[in-house]
């Protein structure tokens, strides 16, 4: 298991109260493959440095995960297929 940090930028038209539950459905992939979710931190709506798909704002969420590389790749793939996800970035922490 490796430690990862995942940043997700979501469509700003989403209701901010539904962000954490909708992310939780994606994070079930990690739990099903034996990984753990250490922390989910929803930053809320922030201005983007540049427009993404004609959006000037996005809802940011940062998630700390312990999982295998294959599990994180599958999570990133599923997030990429969702239309409400504007951008994802996965970073591996070096300890």
From Swiss-Prot:
SUPFAM superfamilies: Ribosomal protein S6
GO biological process: translation
Gene3D superfamilies from the UniProt entry: 3.30.70.60
Pfam families, A to Z: Ribosomal_S6
GO cellular component: cytoplasm; ribonucleoprotein complex; ribosome
InterPro entries, per database record: Ribosomal_bS6 (IPR000529), Ribosomal_bS6_sf (IPR035980), Ribosomal_S6_plastid/chlpt (IPR020814), Transl_elong_EF1B/ribsomal_bS6 (IPR014717)
Family membership noted in the UniProt record: Belongs to the bacterial ribosomal protein bS6 family.
Name the UniProt record assigns to this protein: Small ribosomal subunit protein bS6
Organism field: Rhodococcus erythropolis (strain PR4 / NBRC 100887)
């Amino acid at each position: 298991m490796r430690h990862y940090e995942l940043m997700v930028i979501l469509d700003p038209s989403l209701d901010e109260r539904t962000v954490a539950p909708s992310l939780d459905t994606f994070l079930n992939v990690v739990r099903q493959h034996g990984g753990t979710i250490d922390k989910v931190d929803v930053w809320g709506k922030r201005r983007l440095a540049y427009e993404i798909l004609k959006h000037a704002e996005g809802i940011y969420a940062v998630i700390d995960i312990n999982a295998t590389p294959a599990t994180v790749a599958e999570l990133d793939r599923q997030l990429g297929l969702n239309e409400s996800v504007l951008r994802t970035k996965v970073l591996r922490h070096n300890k």
